[in-house]
Structures are given as structure tokens and as C-alpha cells.
Amino acid sequence: MSLLPRRAPPVSMRLLAAALLLLLLALYTARVDGSKCKCSRKGPKIRYSDVKKLEMKPKYPHCEEKMVIITTKSVSRYRGQEHCLHPKLQSTKRFIKWYNAWNEKRRVYEE
């Protein structure tokens, strides 16, 4: 043990420690904000014919489930809005199944 007083760390070390602490705090808050899935609730009742596009996005790090996003036609009552459907709901699974069947049938008639 020394009798001499300890020297304070240099200013650059204190700045580096403060910057590292701020970076860790920013990463933690970003993770907390982004931890919720967009498709956590049941979506509105939409007819197959009102759907312009159906997208199935893969799992992301912030969400444990895949995302099912539909875009409605601009002439429908939803006026081109995007809706996210909960992928585990039975109604969403049925919607995807019947939308794909309806879309295949529609393609045959359009060709």
C-alpha cells in the first residue's frame, strides 16, 4: 500500500468510459422499444377481394413470429391501408389459405 495519493485517470479514459456507458444505454433502450411485434393483435375483418397484396415476412430478431401484412385496394372501404395480421390466429391461417386459392382462381380467369 502506497502513502502517495492515487492519480485520477486521464480525461481521455473518462470520456471513453462515459461514451461506452451511453452506447450500452442506447442499445438497451432500442432493444426494449423494438421488442414488440407489429402483429400482436387481431386485424380487421377484410374480404379476399379487397386485398391488393399479401406479404409474409420472415421472423426478425425483435419478433419471434413471422409477420403477415396485407395491403388493401384503394377502392375498398380501407382505402389502400396496410394491416398486420397475427400469424398464429386460426382466422389468419384460414385467410391465407383461402386468399391463395382465390388468387389462383382469379389468375386463371384473367389469362
UniProtKB/Swiss-Prot annotation:
Regulation: induction: Up-regulated in peripheral blood lymphocytes in response to bacterial lipopolysaccharides (LPS).
Record family assignment: Belongs to the intercrine alpha (chemokine CxC) family.
Function: Potent chemoattractant for neutrophils, and weaker for dendritic cells. Not chemotactic for T-cells, B-cells, monocytes, natural killer cells or granulocytes. Does not inhibit proliferation of myeloid progenitors in colony formation assays.
Full protein name: C-X-C motif chemokine 14
An individual GO BP term: signal transduction
GO CC term (a single one): Golgi apparatus
Signal peptide: 1-34
Organism: Homo sapiens
Superkingdom of this protein's organism: Eukaryota
Post-translational modification: Ubiquitinated, followed by degradation by the proteasome.
Motif (D-box): 67-81
Matching SUPFAM superfamilies: Interleukin 8-like chemokines (SSF54117)
Tissues/organs with expression: Expressed in heart, brain, placenta, lung, liver, skeletal muscle, kidney and pancreas. Highly expressed in normal tissue without inflammatory stimuli and infrequently expressed in cancer cell lines. Weakly expressed in monocyte-derived dendritic cells. Not detected in lung or unstimulated peripheral blood lymphocytes.
Annotated localization: Secreted
Entry domain remark: The destruction box (D-box) acts as a recognition signal for degradation via the ubiquitin-proteasome pathway.
GO molecular function, one term: chemokine activity
Disulfide bonds: C37-C63, C39-C84
